[in-house]
Protein backbone atom coordinates (compact mmCIF):
# COMPACT_ATOMS: atom_id res chain seq x y z
CA UNK A 1 0.00 0.00 0.00
CA UNK A 2 2.76 2.43 1.00
CA UNK A 3 4.54 1.88 -2.31
CA UNK A 4 1.64 3.24 -4.38
CA UNK A 5 0.96 6.03 -1.88
CA UNK A 6 4.39 7.57 -2.54
CA UNK A 7 3.14 8.86 -5.89
CA UNK A 8 0.08 10.54 -4.29
CA UNK A 9 -0.08 14.27 -3.59
CA UNK A 10 -2.80 16.43 -2.01
CA UNK A 11 -3.44 20.16 -2.01
CA UNK A 12 -6.06 21.77 0.23
CA UNK A 13 -7.22 25.36 -0.08
CA UNK A 14 -9.23 26.81 2.83
CA UNK A 15 -10.94 29.54 0.85
CA UNK A 16 -13.37 32.23 1.97
CA UNK A 17 -16.26 30.71 0.03
CA UNK A 18 -15.33 27.03 -0.37
CA UNK A 19 -12.84 24.52 0.98
CA UNK A 20 -11.26 22.47 -1.80
CA UNK A 21 -9.13 19.34 -1.86
CA UNK A 22 -7.26 18.05 -4.90
CA UNK A 23 -5.66 14.58 -4.83
CA UNK A 24 -3.39 13.60 -7.71
CA UNK A 25 -1.01 10.86 -8.74
CA UNK A 26 2.27 11.55 -10.48
CA UNK A 27 2.47 9.59 -13.73
CA UNK A 28 5.59 9.94 -15.88
CA UNK A 29 6.14 13.62 -15.19
CA UNK A 30 2.49 14.66 -15.41
CA UNK A 31 -0.41 14.57 -12.97
CA UNK A 32 -3.52 12.43 -12.99
CA UNK A 33 -6.43 13.74 -10.91
CA UNK A 34 -7.83 11.13 -8.51
CA UNK A 35 -10.22 13.29 -6.49
CA UNK A 36 -11.60 16.80 -6.37
CA UNK A 37 -13.67 17.53 -3.28
CA UNK A 38 -15.34 20.89 -2.75
CA UNK A 39 -17.60 22.05 0.06
CA UNK A 40 -19.29 25.45 0.34
CA UNK A 41 -18.28 26.58 3.82
CA UNK A 42 -18.76 30.35 3.24
CA UNK A 43 -16.26 31.20 5.97
CA UNK A 44 -16.20 34.90 5.00
CA UNK A 45 -19.92 35.16 5.80
CA UNK A 46 -19.02 34.42 9.44
CA UNK A 47 -16.88 37.56 9.87
CA UNK A 48 -18.45 40.42 11.87
CA UNK A 49 -17.50 44.13 11.78
CA UNK A 50 -14.58 43.46 14.14
CA UNK A 51 -13.34 40.63 11.86
CA UNK A 52 -14.28 38.08 14.49
CA UNK A 53 -15.12 34.68 13.00
CA UNK A 54 -18.39 33.24 14.32
CA UNK A 55 -18.55 29.87 16.07
CA UNK A 56 -21.04 28.62 13.42
CA UNK A 57 -18.66 29.43 10.55
CA UNK A 58 -15.78 27.70 12.34
CA UNK A 59 -17.94 24.62 12.95
CA UNK A 60 -18.82 24.47 9.24
CA UNK A 61 -15.11 24.57 8.42
CA UNK A 62 -14.16 21.88 10.94
CA UNK A 63 -16.93 19.55 9.73
CA UNK A 64 -15.59 19.84 6.20
CA UNK A 65 -12.02 19.13 7.33
CA UNK A 66 -13.13 15.93 9.09
CA UNK A 67 -14.33 14.78 5.68
CA UNK A 68 -10.99 15.69 4.07
CA UNK A 69 -8.87 14.10 6.82
CA UNK A 70 -9.85 10.52 6.00
CA UNK A 71 -8.70 10.97 2.38
CA UNK A 72 -5.33 12.29 3.60
CA UNK A 73 -4.46 9.28 5.76
CA UNK A 74 -2.83 7.32 2.91
CA UNK A 75 -0.69 10.21 1.64
CA UNK A 76 2.84 10.96 2.98
CA UNK A 77 2.90 14.15 5.09
CA UNK A 78 5.56 15.86 2.97
CA UNK A 79 3.30 15.38 -0.08
CA UNK A 80 0.42 17.36 1.42
CA UNK A 81 0.09 21.14 1.36
CA UNK A 82 -2.68 23.01 3.12
CA UNK A 83 -3.06 26.76 2.71
CA UNK A 84 -5.56 29.27 4.07
CA UNK A 85 -6.40 32.51 2.26
CA UNK A 86 -8.25 35.83 2.70
CA UNK A 87 -10.68 35.16 5.57
CA UNK A 88 -8.10 33.48 7.78
CA UNK A 89 -5.61 36.26 6.96
CA UNK A 90 -8.19 38.70 8.27
CA UNK A 91 -9.93 36.93 11.17
CA UNK A 92 -8.86 38.19 14.60
CA UNK A 93 -9.50 34.73 16.08
CA UNK A 94 -7.94 32.76 13.21
CA UNK A 95 -5.60 31.01 15.69
CA UNK A 96 -8.55 29.36 17.41
CA UNK A 97 -9.86 27.98 14.11
CA UNK A 98 -6.41 26.88 12.91
CA UNK A 99 -5.53 25.07 16.16
CA UNK A 100 -8.52 22.72 15.87
CA UNK A 101 -8.18 22.48 12.07
CA UNK A 102 -4.56 21.33 12.40
CA UNK A 103 -5.56 18.67 14.94
CA UNK A 104 -8.29 17.37 12.60
CA UNK A 105 -6.06 17.20 9.51
CA UNK A 106 -2.91 16.05 11.29
CA UNK A 107 -0.73 18.32 9.18
CA UNK A 108 0.36 21.99 9.29
CA UNK A 109 -1.77 24.76 7.75
CA UNK A 110 -0.06 27.75 6.21
CA UNK A 111 -1.87 31.10 6.12
CA UNK A 112 -0.45 32.62 2.94
CA UNK A 113 -0.19 36.30 2.04
CA UNK A 114 -2.22 37.75 -0.82
CA UNK A 115 0.94 38.04 -2.92
CA UNK A 116 1.90 34.41 -2.30
CA UNK A 117 -1.65 33.38 -3.21
CA UNK A 118 -1.36 35.35 -6.47
CA UNK A 119 2.00 33.68 -7.24
CA UNK A 120 0.60 30.18 -6.65
CA UNK A 121 -2.46 30.93 -8.79
CA UNK A 122 -0.22 32.10 -11.62
CA UNK A 123 1.95 28.99 -11.23
CA UNK A 124 -1.15 26.77 -11.51
CA UNK A 125 -2.29 28.62 -14.63
CA UNK A 126 1.17 28.47 -16.24
CA UNK A 127 1.23 24.66 -15.84
CA UNK A 128 -2.27 23.98 -17.13
CA UNK A 129 -3.32 26.69 -19.59
CA UNK A 130 -2.27 26.92 -23.23
CA UNK A 131 -2.01 30.00 -25.41
CA UNK A 132 0.42 32.92 -25.68
CA UNK A 133 3.17 33.29 -23.10
CA UNK A 134 2.32 36.81 -21.92
CA UNK A 135 -0.83 36.61 -19.84
CA UNK A 136 -3.03 38.40 -17.33
CA UNK A 137 -4.62 36.12 -14.73
CA UNK A 138 -7.73 37.13 -12.76
CA UNK A 139 -8.99 35.09 -9.80
CA UNK A 140 -12.07 36.25 -7.88
CA UNK A 141 -12.18 34.36 -4.60
CA UNK A 142 -14.63 34.56 -1.70
CA UNK A 143 -12.67 37.20 0.24
CA UNK A 144 -9.98 38.47 -2.13
CA UNK A 145 -9.30 39.00 -5.81
CA UNK A 146 -5.88 38.30 -7.31
CA UNK A 147 -4.55 39.98 -10.46
CA UNK A 148 -1.26 38.73 -11.92
CA UNK A 149 0.67 39.35 -15.12
CA UNK A 150 3.45 37.06 -16.22
CA UNK A 151 5.47 35.64 -19.04
CA UNK A 152 5.73 31.86 -19.34
CA UNK A 153 6.66 30.53 -15.89
CA UNK A 154 7.59 33.94 -14.48
CA UNK A 155 5.01 36.13 -12.68
CA UNK A 156 5.72 39.88 -12.98
CA UNK A 157 3.05 41.97 -11.23
CA UNK A 158 1.27 40.32 -8.28
CA UNK A 159 -1.67 42.09 -6.63
CA UNK A 160 -4.22 40.86 -4.09
CA UNK A 161 -7.26 43.07 -3.44
CA UNK A 162 -9.55 42.77 -0.40
CA UNK A 163 -12.75 42.13 -2.31
CA UNK A 164 -14.42 38.83 -3.05
CA UNK A 165 -17.74 37.36 -4.07
CA UNK A 166 -18.75 36.48 -0.47
CA UNK A 167 -17.78 39.83 1.09
CA UNK A 168 -19.43 41.74 -1.79
CA UNK A 169 -22.54 39.56 -1.42
CA UNK A 170 -22.88 40.45 2.27
CA UNK A 171 -22.06 44.12 1.68
CA UNK A 172 -24.05 44.99 -1.46
CA UNK A 173 -26.61 42.21 -1.91
CA UNK A 174 -27.35 41.65 1.80
CA UNK A 175 -31.06 42.28 1.21
CA UNK A 176 -30.93 39.56 -1.50
CA UNK A 177 -32.39 42.03 -4.04
CA UNK A 178 -30.90 42.07 -7.52
CA UNK A 179 -31.74 45.74 -8.00
CA UNK A 180 -29.90 47.94 -10.49
CA UNK A 181 -28.81 50.14 -7.55
CA UNK A 182 -27.21 47.18 -5.75
CA UNK A 183 -25.20 46.28 -8.85
CA UNK A 184 -24.14 49.93 -9.28
CA UNK A 185 -22.93 50.16 -5.66
CA UNK A 186 -21.08 46.84 -5.92
CA UNK A 187 -19.42 47.85 -9.20
CA UNK A 188 -18.49 51.32 -7.92
CA UNK A 189 -16.83 49.83 -4.84
CA UNK A 190 -14.92 47.36 -7.04
CA UNK A 191 -13.77 50.23 -9.31
CA UNK A 192 -12.40 52.04 -6.23
CA UNK A 193 -10.41 48.93 -5.26
CA UNK A 194 -8.91 48.38 -8.73
CA UNK A 195 -8.20 52.02 -9.71
CA UNK A 196 -4.92 52.39 -7.74
CA UNK A 197 -3.30 49.43 -9.60
CA UNK A 198 -5.07 49.64 -12.98
CA UNK A 199 -2.55 51.86 -14.78
CA UNK A 200 0.37 49.63 -13.81
CA UNK A 201 -1.38 46.64 -15.39
CA UNK A 202 -2.45 48.52 -18.52
CA UNK A 203 1.09 49.80 -19.10
CA UNK A 204 2.56 46.32 -18.68
CA UNK A 205 0.11 44.77 -21.18
CA UNK A 206 -0.66 41.13 -22.02
CA UNK A 207 -1.54 38.95 -25.01
CA UNK A 208 -4.22 36.84 -23.39
CA UNK A 209 -6.41 37.15 -20.30
CA UNK A 210 -7.51 34.09 -18.33
CA UNK A 211 -9.92 33.80 -15.42
CA UNK A 212 -9.34 31.20 -12.72
CA UNK A 213 -12.33 31.48 -10.39
CA UNK A 214 -15.77 30.02 -9.73
CA UNK A 215 -17.35 33.14 -11.25
CA UNK A 216 -15.51 32.55 -14.53
CA UNK A 217 -16.31 28.82 -14.38
CA UNK A 218 -19.99 29.72 -13.95
CA UNK A 219 -19.83 32.06 -16.96
CA UNK A 220 -18.26 29.29 -19.05
CA UNK A 221 -21.06 26.88 -18.05
CA UNK A 222 -23.71 29.48 -18.95
CA UNK A 223 -22.14 30.06 -22.37
CA UNK A 224 -21.85 26.35 -23.16
CA UNK A 225 -25.49 25.80 -22.10
CA UNK A 226 -26.61 28.66 -24.35
CA UNK A 227 -24.53 27.57 -27.36
CA UNK A 228 -22.28 30.65 -27.30
CA UNK A 229 -18.54 30.66 -27.91
CA UNK A 230 -16.33 30.49 -24.82
CA UNK A 231 -14.88 34.01 -24.99
CA UNK A 232 -16.05 36.14 -22.07
CA UNK A 233 -16.59 39.76 -23.12
CA UNK A 234 -17.90 42.87 -21.39
CA UNK A 235 -20.99 42.83 -23.63
CA UNK A 236 -21.85 39.29 -22.45
CA UNK A 237 -21.30 40.29 -18.80
CA UNK A 238 -23.62 43.30 -19.17
CA UNK A 239 -26.21 41.07 -20.84
CA UNK A 240 -26.10 38.64 -17.89
CA UNK A 241 -26.36 41.52 -15.43
CA UNK A 242 -29.57 42.71 -17.15
CA UNK A 243 -30.91 39.15 -16.99
CA UNK A 244 -30.14 39.01 -13.24
CA UNK A 245 -31.84 42.39 -12.63
CA UNK A 246 -34.96 41.09 -14.42
CA UNK A 247 -35.04 38.12 -12.01
CA UNK A 248 -35.41 40.61 -9.14
CA UNK A 249 -34.36 38.44 -6.20
CA UNK A 250 -31.39 36.21 -5.50
CA UNK A 251 -33.72 33.30 -4.67
CA UNK A 252 -35.36 33.68 -8.09
CA UNK A 253 -32.15 33.98 -10.12
CA UNK A 254 -32.52 31.62 -13.07
CA UNK A 255 -30.13 31.68 -16.00
CA UNK A 256 -29.76 28.60 -18.27
CA UNK A 257 -26.47 26.93 -17.33
CA UNK A 258 -26.15 28.56 -13.90
CA UNK A 259 -26.19 25.91 -11.18
CA UNK A 260 -27.98 26.45 -7.88
CA UNK A 261 -24.66 25.99 -6.08
CA UNK A 262 -23.03 28.91 -7.94
CA UNK A 263 -26.11 31.18 -8.03
CA UNK A 264 -25.72 32.72 -4.56
CA UNK A 265 -22.38 34.45 -5.20
CA UNK A 266 -22.83 34.91 -8.96
CA UNK A 267 -24.20 38.52 -8.92
CA UNK A 268 -21.45 39.73 -6.56
CA UNK A 269 -18.74 37.98 -8.60
CA UNK A 270 -20.25 39.38 -11.79
CA UNK A 271 -20.12 42.95 -10.40
CA UNK A 272 -16.43 42.58 -9.55
CA UNK A 273 -15.63 41.09 -12.97
CA UNK A 274 -17.44 43.90 -14.82
CA UNK A 275 -15.38 46.48 -12.90
CA UNK A 276 -12.13 44.59 -13.68
CA UNK A 277 -13.00 44.45 -17.40
CA UNK A 278 -13.72 48.18 -17.45
CA UNK A 279 -10.74 49.34 -15.36
CA UNK A 280 -8.17 47.19 -17.18
CA UNK A 281 -9.80 47.56 -20.64
CA UNK A 282 -9.96 43.77 -21.08
CA UNK A 283 -11.27 42.76 -24.51
CA UNK A 284 -11.92 39.09 -23.76
CA UNK A 285 -11.17 36.36 -21.23
CA UNK A 286 -11.09 32.56 -21.28
CA UNK A 287 -11.22 30.03 -18.47
CA UNK A 288 -7.89 28.86 -17.00
CA UNK A 289 -7.10 25.15 -16.75
CA UNK A 290 -6.03 25.38 -13.11
CA UNK A 291 -5.16 27.79 -10.32
CA UNK A 292 -4.17 27.75 -6.63
CA UNK A 293 -4.43 24.01 -5.91
CA UNK A 294 -2.68 23.09 -9.15
CA UNK A 295 0.03 25.63 -8.27
CA UNK A 296 0.54 23.88 -4.92
CA UNK A 297 0.72 20.41 -6.51
CA UNK A 298 3.13 21.37 -9.29
CA UNK A 299 5.24 23.19 -6.69
CA UNK A 300 5.61 19.96 -4.68
CA UNK A 301 6.46 17.99 -7.83
CA UNK A 302 9.09 20.54 -8.96
CA UNK A 303 8.04 20.03 -12.58
CA UNK A 304 9.28 22.67 -15.04
CA UNK A 305 6.72 24.84 -16.82
CA UNK A 306 6.62 23.70 -20.44
CA UNK A 307 6.81 26.31 -23.18
CA UNK A 308 3.98 24.58 -25.04
CA UNK A 309 1.52 22.95 -22.66
CA UNK A 310 -0.71 21.60 -25.43
CA UNK A 311 2.23 19.79 -27.06
CA UNK A 312 3.16 18.28 -23.67
CA UNK A 313 -0.43 17.03 -23.31
CA UNK A 314 -0.38 15.48 -26.79
CA UNK A 315 3.00 13.79 -26.12
CA UNK A 316 1.60 12.35 -22.89
CA UNK A 317 -1.43 11.00 -24.80
CA UNK A 318 0.85 9.41 -27.39
CA UNK A 319 2.80 7.65 -24.62
CA UNK A 320 -0.23 6.67 -22.56
CA UNK A 321 -2.14 5.17 -25.50
CA UNK A 322 0.95 3.72 -27.25
CA UNK A 323 0.34 5.65 -30.46
CA UNK A 324 2.57 5.20 -33.50
CA UNK A 325 4.43 8.52 -33.27
CA UNK A 326 6.17 8.02 -36.63
CA UNK A 327 2.81 7.68 -38.38
CA UNK A 328 1.38 10.64 -36.45
CA UNK A 329 4.34 12.76 -37.60
CA UNK A 330 3.96 11.51 -41.19
CA UNK A 331 0.26 12.49 -41.32
CA UNK A 332 1.03 15.77 -39.57
CA UNK A 333 3.78 16.76 -42.05
CA UNK A 334 1.60 15.92 -45.04
CA UNK A 335 -1.43 17.76 -43.63
CA UNK A 336 0.78 20.79 -42.97
CA UNK A 337 2.01 20.67 -46.56
CA UNK A 338 -1.61 20.58 -47.75
CA UNK A 339 -2.50 23.44 -45.40
CA UNK A 340 0.20 25.72 -46.82
CA UNK A 341 -1.08 25.08 -50.36
CA UNK A 342 -4.66 26.23 -49.64
CA UNK A 343 -4.38 28.63 -46.67
CA UNK A 344 -4.69 31.80 -48.79
CA UNK A 345 -7.67 30.68 -50.85
CA UNK A 346 -9.50 29.37 -47.78
CA UNK A 347 -8.40 32.23 -45.45
CA UNK A 348 -6.97 29.87 -42.84
CA UNK A 349 -4.85 31.27 -39.99
CA UNK A 350 -2.27 30.15 -37.41
CA UNK A 351 -4.95 28.82 -35.07
CA UNK A 352 -6.24 26.55 -37.83
CA UNK A 353 -2.75 25.26 -38.56
CA UNK A 354 -2.21 24.35 -34.89
CA UNK A 355 -5.59 22.60 -34.60
CA UNK A 356 -4.85 20.53 -37.70
CA UNK A 357 -1.44 19.54 -36.32
CA UNK A 358 -2.96 18.59 -32.97
CA UNK A 359 -5.62 16.41 -34.59
CA UNK A 360 -2.99 14.64 -36.72
CA UNK A 361 -0.76 13.85 -33.74
CA UNK A 362 -3.52 11.90 -31.93
CA UNK A 363 -5.78 10.81 -34.81
CA UNK A 364 -5.19 7.09 -34.09
CA UNK A 365 -6.03 7.27 -30.37
CA UNK A 366 -9.33 5.42 -30.99
CA UNK A 367 -7.40 2.29 -32.04
CA UNK A 368 -6.40 1.88 -28.38
CA UNK A 369 -10.04 0.93 -27.73
CA UNK A 370 -10.81 -1.02 -30.92
CA UNK A 371 -10.33 -0.79 -34.69
CA UNK A 372 -14.09 -0.97 -35.17
CA UNK A 373 -15.56 2.53 -34.68
CA UNK A 374 -12.06 3.92 -33.94
CA UNK A 375 -13.02 7.51 -34.94
CA UNK A 376 -15.98 7.45 -32.51
CA UNK A 377 -13.74 6.07 -29.75
CA UNK A 378 -11.18 8.81 -30.48
CA UNK A 379 -13.83 11.52 -30.25
CA UNK A 380 -15.17 10.09 -26.98
CA UNK A 381 -11.70 9.98 -25.40
CA UNK A 382 -10.84 13.55 -26.40
CA UNK A 383 -14.18 14.89 -25.15
CA UNK A 384 -13.78 13.19 -21.78
CA UNK A 385 -10.06 13.17 -20.97
CA UNK A 386 -8.47 15.90 -18.86
CA UNK A 387 -6.30 17.74 -21.41
CA UNK A 388 -4.20 20.51 -19.80
CA UNK A 389 -3.84 23.47 -22.14
CA UNK A 390 -7.07 22.81 -24.06
CA UNK A 391 -10.28 24.70 -23.35
CA UNK A 392 -13.67 22.89 -23.51
CA UNK A 393 -14.38 24.44 -26.94
CA UNK A 394 -10.99 23.35 -28.28
CA UNK A 395 -11.60 19.79 -27.05
CA UNK A 396 -14.96 19.82 -28.82
CA UNK A 397 -13.34 20.87 -32.11
CA UNK A 398 -10.62 18.22 -31.81
CA UNK A 399 -13.20 15.51 -31.09
CA UNK A 400 -15.31 16.68 -34.08
CA UNK A 401 -12.26 16.45 -36.39
CA UNK A 402 -11.32 13.00 -35.07
CA UNK A 403 -14.86 11.64 -35.37
CA UNK A 404 -14.92 12.84 -38.99
CA UNK A 405 -11.47 11.54 -39.99
CA UNK A 406 -12.89 8.81 -42.26
CA UNK A 407 -16.08 7.40 -43.78
CA UNK A 408 -19.38 9.29 -43.25
CA UNK A 409 -19.10 12.99 -42.47
CA UNK A 410 -21.26 14.41 -39.67
CA UNK A 411 -21.43 18.11 -40.53
CA UNK A 412 -23.38 19.00 -37.39
CA UNK A 413 -20.35 18.18 -35.20
CA UNK A 414 -18.16 20.58 -37.15
CA UNK A 415 -20.83 23.28 -37.22
CA UNK A 416 -21.78 23.11 -33.54
CA UNK A 417 -18.29 23.59 -32.07
CA UNK A 418 -17.30 27.16 -31.19
CA UNK A 419 -13.49 27.13 -31.30
CA UNK A 420 -13.40 28.07 -35.02
CA UNK A 421 -15.92 29.31 -37.60
CA UNK A 422 -17.75 26.32 -39.12
CA UNK A 423 -16.29 26.77 -42.63
CA UNK A 424 -12.72 26.72 -41.25
CA UNK A 425 -13.44 23.55 -39.24
CA UNK A 426 -14.83 21.92 -42.40
CA UNK A 427 -11.71 22.86 -44.41
CA UNK A 428 -9.44 21.34 -41.73
CA UNK A 429 -11.50 18.16 -41.75
CA UNK A 430 -11.00 17.78 -45.51
CA UNK A 431 -7.22 18.21 -45.22
CA UNK A 432 -7.00 15.73 -42.32
CA UNK A 433 -8.95 13.07 -44.22
CA UNK A 434 -6.74 13.41 -47.31
CA UNK A 435 -3.50 13.31 -45.29
CA UNK A 436 -4.65 10.08 -43.61
CA UNK A 437 -5.50 8.43 -46.97
CA UNK A 438 -2.21 9.39 -48.64
CA UNK A 439 -0.20 8.20 -45.58
CA UNK A 440 -2.03 4.88 -45.26
CA UNK A 441 1.01 2.81 -46.40
CA UNK A 442 2.82 4.07 -43.25
CA UNK A 443 6.07 4.67 -45.17
CA UNK A 444 7.65 7.96 -46.16
CA UNK A 445 8.91 6.65 -49.51
CA UNK A 446 5.35 5.96 -50.70
CA UNK A 447 4.13 9.56 -50.31
CA UNK A 448 3.55 11.15 -53.71
CA UNK A 449 4.16 14.80 -54.57
CA UNK A 450 0.52 15.85 -54.18
CA UNK A 451 -0.61 19.29 -55.19
CA UNK A 452 -3.85 20.79 -53.89
CA UNK A 453 -5.73 23.67 -55.41
CA UNK A 454 -8.76 25.27 -53.78
CA UNK A 455 -11.34 27.18 -55.78
CA UNK A 456 -14.03 28.41 -53.38
CA UNK A 457 -15.37 25.17 -51.91
CA UNK A 458 -14.02 22.94 -54.67
CA UNK A 459 -10.78 21.11 -53.89
CA UNK A 460 -8.60 19.75 -56.72
CA UNK A 461 -6.18 16.95 -55.83
CA UNK A 462 -3.37 16.68 -58.39
CA UNK A 463 -1.16 13.56 -58.37
CA UNK A 464 1.75 12.55 -60.66
CA UNK A 465 0.97 10.95 -64.04
CA UNK A 466 0.25 7.22 -63.67
CA UNK A 467 0.20 7.32 -59.85
CA UNK A 468 -3.46 6.26 -59.51
CA UNK A 469 -2.91 3.18 -61.71
CA UNK A 470 0.23 2.17 -59.78
CA UNK A 471 -1.51 2.55 -56.39
CA UNK A 472 -4.96 0.94 -56.78
CA UNK A 473 -5.67 0.72 -53.02
CA UNK A 474 -5.23 4.43 -52.42
CA UNK A 475 -6.80 5.30 -55.78
CA UNK A 476 -9.94 3.47 -54.69
CA UNK A 477 -9.84 5.16 -51.27
CA UNK A 478 -9.59 8.59 -52.95
CA UNK A 479 -12.45 7.75 -55.30
CA UNK A 480 -14.60 6.75 -52.31
CA UNK A 481 -13.48 9.90 -50.48
CA UNK A 482 -14.71 12.10 -53.33
CA UNK A 483 -18.14 10.47 -52.83
CA UNK A 484 -18.10 10.97 -49.03
CA UNK A 485 -17.23 14.64 -49.51
CA UNK A 486 -19.78 15.15 -52.29
CA UNK A 487 -22.56 13.94 -49.95
CA UNK A 488 -21.96 17.08 -47.82
CA UNK A 489 -21.50 19.39 -50.83
CA UNK A 490 -17.69 19.43 -50.69
CA UNK A 491 -16.59 18.99 -54.33
CA UNK A 492 -13.37 16.91 -54.45
CA UNK A 493 -11.82 16.41 -57.88
CA UNK A 494 -8.94 14.02 -58.63
CA UNK A 495 -6.59 14.82 -61.50
CA UNK A 496 -3.29 13.47 -62.78
CA UNK A 497 -0.58 15.93 -63.78
CA UNK A 498 0.36 15.53 -67.40
From Swiss-Prot:
Q: What is this protein called?
A: Guanosine-5'-triphosphate,3'-diphosphate pyrophosphatase
- Which species does the entry assign this protein to? Yersinia pestis
- Catalytic reactions on record: guanosine 3'-diphosphate 5'-triphosphate + H2O = guanosine 3',5'-bis(diphosphate) + phosphate + H(+)
Q: Does the keyword Hydrolase apply?
A: yes
Task: Please provide the Gene Ontology terms (biological process) for this protein.
Answer: guanosine pentaphosphate catabolic process; guanosine tetraphosphate biosynthetic process; nucleobase-containing small molecule interconversion
Q: In which pathway does it act?
A: Purine metabolism; ppGpp biosynthesis; ppGpp from GTP: step 2/2
User: Keywords assigned by UniProt?
Assistant: Hydrolase
Q: Which HAMAP family match?
A: GppA
Molecular-function GO terms, alphabetical: exopolyphosphatase activity; guanosine-5'-triphosphate,3'-diphosphate diphosphatase activity
Name the InterPro entries on file: ATPase_NBD (IPR043129), Exopolyphosphatase (IPR022371), GppA/Ppx_hydrolase (IPR050273), Guo-5TP_3DP_PyrP (IPR023709), Ppx_GppA_C (IPR048950), Ppx_GppA_N (IPR003695), PyroPPase_GppA_Ppx (IPR030673)
Establish whether keyword Hydrolase is in the entry.
Answer: yes
The primary gene name is: gppA
UniProt enzyme class: hydrolase
* Family the UniProt entry places it in: Belongs to the GppA/Ppx family. GppA subfamily.
Cite the PANTHER family for this sequence.
EXOPOLYPHOSPHATASE, RETROGRADE REGULATION PROTEIN 2
Record's function text: Catalyzes the conversion of pppGpp to ppGpp. Guanosine pentaphosphate (pppGpp) is a cytoplasmic signaling molecule which together with ppGpp controls the 'stringent response', an adaptive process that allows bacteria to respond to amino acid starvation, resulting in the coordinated regulation of numerous cellular activities.
EC number of the protein: 3.6.1.40
Amino acid sequence: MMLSSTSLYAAIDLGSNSFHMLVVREVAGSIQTLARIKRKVRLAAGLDNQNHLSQEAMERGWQCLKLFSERLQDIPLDQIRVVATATLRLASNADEFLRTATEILGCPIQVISGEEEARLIYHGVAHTTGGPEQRLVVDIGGGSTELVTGNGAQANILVSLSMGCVTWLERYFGDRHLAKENFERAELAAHEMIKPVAQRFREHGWQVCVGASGTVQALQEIMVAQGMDELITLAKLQQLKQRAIQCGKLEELEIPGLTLERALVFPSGLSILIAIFQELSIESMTLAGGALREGLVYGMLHLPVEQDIRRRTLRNLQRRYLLDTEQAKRVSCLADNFFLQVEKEWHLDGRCREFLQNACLIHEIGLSVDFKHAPQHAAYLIRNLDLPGFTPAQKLLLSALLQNQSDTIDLSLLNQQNALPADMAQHLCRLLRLAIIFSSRRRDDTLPAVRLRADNNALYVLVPQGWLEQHPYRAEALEQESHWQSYVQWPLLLEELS
